[in-house]
């Protein structure tokens, strides 16, 4: 299924990083904070004034957007104003 964001929205896929304690114990998802880093999957046609393209990594507001599930994968539909930064690695 393909989802195309409307207006000034983007479809992003959160990047989940495995968290371990100093002792090497892997923390379950319920003990971790929400991810704030994501990959841009689709961009709405009205998104302007930001230098972001599909495939870029971004930092977004912690509780922004609407979480959706597509083909058993987690995504977020988010307003362009909730994108805080572009990550360059």
Swiss-Prot record:
GO biological process: chaperone cofactor-dependent protein refolding
InterPro entries: Chaperonin_GroES, Chaperonin_GroES_sf, Chaprnonin_Cpn10_CS, GroES-like_sf
Keyword Chaperone: yes
Alphabetical UniProt keywords: Chaperone, Cytoplasm
Subunit structure: Heptamer of 7 subunits arranged in a ring. Interacts with the chaperonin GroEL.
Family: Belongs to the GroES chaperonin family.
Name of the protein in its database record: Co-chaperonin GroES
Species the sequence originates in: Kosmotoga olearia (strain ATCC BAA-1733 / DSM 21960 / TBF 19.5.1)
């Amino acid at each position: 299924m393909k989802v195309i964001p409307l207006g000034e929205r983007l479809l992003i896929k959160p990047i989940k990083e495995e968290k371990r304690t100093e002792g090497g114990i892997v923390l379950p998802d319920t003990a971790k904070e929400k991810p704030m880093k994501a990959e841009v999957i689709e961009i709405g046609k009205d998104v302007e004034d930001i230098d972001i393209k599909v495939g870029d990594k971004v930092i977004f507001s912690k509780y922004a957007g609407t979480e959706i599930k597509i083909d058993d994968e987690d995504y977020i539909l988010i307003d362009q104003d909730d994108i805080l930064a572009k990550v360059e690695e």
